[in-house]
Design a protein with these regions (language model features):
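Conserved functional hotspots at enzyme active or ligand-binding sites that engage polyanionic ligands
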Residues: 1-110
Length: 110
């Protein structure tokens, strides 16, 4: 579970993985991989109205990303989650896109 990877995050408490889930990008520094937590930013379907929202980063479906369409990383919803909730690795994003998402989180935090 490394920085820039796209994973499916289970949002409920069930261990069966049959509940609600969403895609997230891992932003945690890889040096912290020994911890059972990751800092993630959720992905939502891109809408043209997001262009004016600096906390929404457009994420195209680049090769090996696991994305099937254009998504938006919602930096306002940054959170730390247990690695046990990260159920399926979908792919990874280029460093350039990951850094754009991290910069948006920095703007949100101030």
């Amino acid at each position: 579970m490394n920085r820039g990877e796209v994973w499916r995050l289970a949002l409920d408490d069930s261990e069966e993985g049959e509940g609600i889930s969403r895609m997230v990008i891992i932003l945690s520094n890889d040096a912290l991989a020994v911890l059972p937590l990751r800092v993630v930013v959720p992905l939502v379907a891109w809408r043209d109205t997001f262009v004016t929202a600096p906390w929404m980063v457009r994420v195209p479906p680049v090769l090996n990303s696991g994305l099937e369409g254009v998504m938006a990383a919602d930096a306002l919803q940054v959170r730390s989650v247990s690695t046990a909730r990260l159920t399926t690795r979908l792919g990874s994003l280029p460093e350039r896109i990951t850094n754009q998402v991290a910069a948006a989180v920095g703007e949100v935090i101030g």
